C-alpha cells in the first residue's frame, strides 16, 4: 500500500493508464480479428476493407507504446500478404 501522497497519486495514474492501454489493446485485437474472419470467409473486398481499418489502429497502438512498433509492422505485413493472396 502506498504511504506517501506522491506514491498514492502514482498508483492512481498507473491504474488510469492501465485501463486506457487495455482498452487500446482490446480495440486492436478486435480490428485484427475482423480481418482474420474476412480472410477465413474468403471475401477479398471485405478483407481489404477490414485491413484498411485495422492498419491505422495498429500504428496508433504502436505510437502510444501499447505494442512495439516492429510488432505492429509485422502484423500489418502478414495480414496484407494474406489479403493479397485472396485476390490471386
UniProtKB/Swiss-Prot annotation:
GO terms for molecular function: small ribosomal subunit rRNA binding; structural constituent of ribosome. Keywords: Ribonucleoprotein, Ribosomal protein, RNA-binding, rRNA-binding. GO terms for cellular component: cytosol; small ribosomal subunit. SUPFAM superfamilies: Ribosomal protein S20. One of its GO terms (biological process) is translation. Pfam families: Ribosomal_S20p. Binds directly to 16S ribosomal RNA. Belongs to the bacterial ribosomal protein bS20 family. This is Small ribosomal subunit protein bS20.
